């Protein structure tokens, strides 16, 4: 059985300071309770989960220690950050990799997300060591079969914000890694996301300290659940949101979730249970998107059509840049074009899945998300791919076997 108290205590001993983030212990207790009751872990799986949760607290406390020793870090400005988001599997990672071609922005690197200390600006020589250590760690861990087709990832590429949000145990994506439905609903309804994003900001300040200041581009699909909280922490935040057929999103996130949970679960993962969990998961994300859109700050979101993005990435980047009030230099457009040419669709394998595999009915799913699709002019997958000129030869509806993602990994 996992125990929140022992995890925090071990992290405190490892770093040598007391945990002063008052909100975090309660978040971890809720998560651990849900894990112990709702997610039967194999012995190896439980070790993996505990190791990850411990690393989260160690990384957070190391950041706190740096702040204690160098209080000027708290004054480090995080100016005009761009938050990249959208429903999970709606092209956010693809868009992040395009964004990474623009050197005017700072993105989190893969090794930084899991090994953020010491701050790179304070110990530049450690960067090379940590990069190499991260690559070796990934080789040792391995990925599930088909991972590269399902998720775009490079060992030395840009990374999302999950690890920084997980430092406070406030990351919605934990429900994809582990089955924790009670924790997920508590996160959505009660967890203090303002504190979660303050800890997230603190980590950005640490990475930026004594380094060149650039606007941050911060990708995490699940940022959509905390837009108001992000604005409380970052009043000058800018938002970019991708949109894709929710039926396709749902089938794809179900496959990803099934594979991730299977690595830690004691027995076979019930695919229909995954489908039910993810239907609720996506519904709650859509509800947050729609609620924010109707609110006073809905106009601050730049909306990106997934199908337009894969049809003409440079055009969509130019449109997005106009929304941000900046130009698109020729070298950025050329870099985006070159990256797309080097990473053609299905280059890392096909990604096959269907709603039916997860016990979901395509017609009822489509009906459930009609209002969202109408509001953001999101076409059904087949229509969108046809419009983009990327329609494969086989069936391409999430309700039928043989569906695939037209880019390597959204």
Model feature map: region roles:
Residues 101-111:
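Post-Walker A helix-loop "phosphate-sensing" segment adjacent to the P-loop in P-loop NTPases
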Residues 114-216:
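PAPS-dependent sulfation machinery
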Residues 1-65, 72, 181-197, 204-211, ...:
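PAPS-dependent sulfotransferases, especially Golgi type II membrane carbohydrate sulfotransferases
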Residues 85-87, 217-221, 306:
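Short His-Asn-centered micro-motif
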Residues 73-79:
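Phosphate-binding P-loop
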Residues 84-101:
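Glycine-rich phosphate-binding P-loop
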Residues 219, 230-255:
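Conserved phosphate-donor/acceptor-positioning beta-strand/loop module used by diverse small-molecule
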Residues 115, 223-229, 247-250, 310-313:
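Flexible loop/turn segments at secondary-structure boundaries
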């Amino acid at each position: 059985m996992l125990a929140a108290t022992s995890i925090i205590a071990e992290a405190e001993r490892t770093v040598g300071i007391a945990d002063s983030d008052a909100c975090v212990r309660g978040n971890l207790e809720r998560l651990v309770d849900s894990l112990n009751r709702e997610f039967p872990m194999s012995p190896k799986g439980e070790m993996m989960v505990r190791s990850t949760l411990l690393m989260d607290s160690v990384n957070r406390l190391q950041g706190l220690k740096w702040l204690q020793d160098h209080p000027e870090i708290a004054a480090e400005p995080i100016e005009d950050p761009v938050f990249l988001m959208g429903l999970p599997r709606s092209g956010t990672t693809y868009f992040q990799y395009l964004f990474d071609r623009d050197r005017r922005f700072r993105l989190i690197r893969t090794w930084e997300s899991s090994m953020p200390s010491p701050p790179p600006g304070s110990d530049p020589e450690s960067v090379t060591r940590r990069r190499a250590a991260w690559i070796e760690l990934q080789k040792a861990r391995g990925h599930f079969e088909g991972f590269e087709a399902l998720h775009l990832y490079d060992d030395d590429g840009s990374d999302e914000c999950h690890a920084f949000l997980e430092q406070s145990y406030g990351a919605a994506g934990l429900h994809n890694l582990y089955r924790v439905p009670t924790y997920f609903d508590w996160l959505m309804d009660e967890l203090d996301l303002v504190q979660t994003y303050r800890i997230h900001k603190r980590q950005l300040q640490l990475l930026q300290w004594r380094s060149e200041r650039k606007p941050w581009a911060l990708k995490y699909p699940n940022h959509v659940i905390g837009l108001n909280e992000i604005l409380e922490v970052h009043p000058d935040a800018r938002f970019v949101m991708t949109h894709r057929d929710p039926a396709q999103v749902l089938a794809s996130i179900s496959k990803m979730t099934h594979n991730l949970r299977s690595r830690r679960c004691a027995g076979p993962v019930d695919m229909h249970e995954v489908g039910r969990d993810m239907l609720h998961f996506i519904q709650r994300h859509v509800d947050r998107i729609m609620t924010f859109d109707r609110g006073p700050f809905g106009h601050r979101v730049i909306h990106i059509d997934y199908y337009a993005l894969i049809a003409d990435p440079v055009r969509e980047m130019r449109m997005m840049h106009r929304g941000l009030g900046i130009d698109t230099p020729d070298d950025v457009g050329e870099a985006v074009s070159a990256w797309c040419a080097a990473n053609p669709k299905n280059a890392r394998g096909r990604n096959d899945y269907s709603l039916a595999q997860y016990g979901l009915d395509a017609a009822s799913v489509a009906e459930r998300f009609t209002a969202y699709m109408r509001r953001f002019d999101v076409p059904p997958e087949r229509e969108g791919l046809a419009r983009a000129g990327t329609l494969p030869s086989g069936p391409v509806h999430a309700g039928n076997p043989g569906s695939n993602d037209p880019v390597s990994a959204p």
